[in-house]
Amino acid sequence: MAMNGLSKMAVAAATALLLVLTIVPGAVAVTYTIEWTTGVDYSGWATGKTFRVGDILEFKYGSSHTVDVVDKAGYDGCDASSSTENHSDGDTKIDLKTVGINYFICSTPGHCRTNGGMKLAVNVVAGSAGPPATPTPPSSTPGTPTTPESPPSGGSPTPTTPTPGAGSTSPPPPPKASGASKGVMSYVLVGVSMVLGYGLWM
């Protein structure tokens, strides 16, 4: 009888572990690294990406730039006077906490309005149980043309030349690993747990 109770506890524990591991992929936050500089089409970069509550935007930028969290009016008018956050440390991490469109601009005069502007709007949705999408950070080396992530079929992309800013003389760092590999690993753990759980039933 004691063995039967022990087996039931093991099955219950394996089932609980399986349930937790099934939920984990949706709970893994993705960090999107953004090379925050002039001459980048940030609206194009954000298109097609799914940002979720809990994800992190990591802005990397030179000393001539800022990251300001603004409302739609501040975004549209490139006005940071009513910003809720103002950063100038060169490596700013912002947790996406609210569902809806989140707005970011550079408040350095001329940067928000020039060459498409240093402004970013991301639509944030509630978390889900699926694995996160692979983020692709925008990057550009000052003085080097930038192109869209995927050029339109039948035509060639039109490059733009960014204006070099103070403190932005080195090329951007390579993209960071995405959260997608974490999601795949979670599914591997779920599979292993299922096999182990099946062994307990036998």
UniProtKB/Swiss-Prot annotation:
Residues 129-181 are annotated as: Disordered. This is Uclacyanin-2. Probably acts as an electron carrier involved in oxygen activation and/or lignin formation. InterPro entries: Cupredoxin (IPR008972), Phytocyanin-like (IPR039391), Phytocyanin_dom (IPR003245). Its main location: membrane. Residues 30-126 form the Phytocyanin domain. GO terms for cellular component: plasma membrane; plasmodesma; side of membrane. Glycans are attached at N86. Cu cation binds at H65, C106, H111, M118. It is found in: Cell membrane. A lipid is attached at S178 (GPI-anchor amidated serine). PROSITE patterns: PHYTOCYANIN (PS51485). Keywords: Cell membrane, Copper, Electron transport, Glycoprotein, GPI-anchor, Lipoprotein, Membrane, Metal-binding, Signal, Transport. Residues 179-202 form a propeptide. It is a lipid-anchor; GPI-anchor. Pfam families: Cu_bind_like (PF02298).
